[in-house]
């Protein structure tokens, strides 16, 4: 029996860190094909193609410099070619690009392909909230799991100990993905509440923007802790309103929940850019260009999508933190008023 073929759809900071793990495991485990393809959006780096650099130097010099990728990870610039014959697709691209990628892949996959989304964000469908894994699953007709956790990519690539959560309705798929991705320093728990796991991954980026505003305005640790707690309460309230499946508080205690929220509010790029926004008054777009080396922020865009859903349901005032982040980012509300928005939070009534 030939091993299962794996394709990583995406090659940014997080995609490259995951490629390091998946490539290492696939080379050692008999029931995976050792050759792992990684779709790379082709870029010119100092006159050379990024795919060529990755395939000769085994390093993503743009998005994960200083880390060697296993030689069995092969960069491919054509997404259809990269995913050809794949049994497992790992999706790890900015959420705003997933629709276009699915359109390209549609009709080109094996009948029994399974997918896992590492993408943190939500989409706005005609009936309100659409999770990214749902978008992929529906467009491609494949069963989807998700992986979310307190996983800052550079630390994962450095092989520093951390945990993560796989949400999978299908237990066999969950175990297969765990085997493919778990290492001694990347520990995985599998749970069945896919929707809750994914909602956590998306919403924590909005809270992190709020935490960054808090840092930029010079508030202390007490204020930031309050922002994190109120953010968590809004995440739970939102999940209970909008998830189709069951939502248990226990899932919020997994790595995908409170752990990911804490690490993102202290160490992630959404926090970093939001702090600079509060300090400098430059636009989010400008700071993205200056600070992120071509990466995209997920927090502000998720806040906008969420705001639209909450408006549609007439529930904006039930989520003051999410709403305040949206208004500061998109409606020119002074960032200095951010804390005022939390002083009359429903949690305190």
Curated annotation (Swiss-Prot):
Mark the residues carrying the PTM N6-succinyllysine.
289
Gene Ontology molecular function, alphabetical: glycerol-3-phosphate dehydrogenase (NAD+) activity; glycerol-3-phosphate dehydrogenase (quinone) activity; NAD binding; protein homodimerization activity
The chain residues annotated with the modification Phosphotyrosine are 326
Q: List the GO cellular component terms.
A: cytosol
* Top EC class, one word: oxidoreductase
UniProt-annotated catalytic positions: 204 (proton acceptor)
Q: Which UniProt keywords apply?
A: Cytoplasm, NAD, Oxidoreductase, Phosphoprotein
- Catalytic reaction(s) noted: sn-glycerol 3-phosphate + NAD(+) = dihydroxyacetone phosphate + NADH + H(+)
Q: What is its main location?
A: cytoplasm
Q: Which Gene3D superfamilies does this one have? A: N-(1-d-carboxylethyl)-l-norvaline Dehydrogenase, domain 2, NAD(P)-binding Rossmann-like Domain
**InterPro entries given in the database record:** 6-PGluconate_DH-like_C_sf (IPR008927), 6PGD_dom2 (IPR013328), G3P_DH_NAD-dep (IPR006168), G3P_DH_NAD-dep_C (IPR006109), G3P_DH_NAD-dep_euk (IPR017751), G3P_DH_NAD-dep_N (IPR011128), NAD(P)-bd_dom_sf (IPR036291)
E.C. no: 1.1.1.8
Question: GO biological process: any one?
Answer: carbohydrate metabolic process
Location comes to: Cytoplasm
Which residues take part in binding substrate? 120, 269-270
In this chain, NAD(+) is annotated as bound at 10-15, 153, 269, 296, 298
- Family note: Belongs to the NAD-dependent glycerol-3-phosphate dehydrogenase family.
Role according to the record: Has glycerol-3-phosphate dehydrogenase activity.
Quaternary assembly = Homodimer.
Q: What name goes with this protein?
A: Glycerol-3-phosphate dehydrogenase [NAD(+)], cytoplasmic
Designated gene of the protein = GPD1
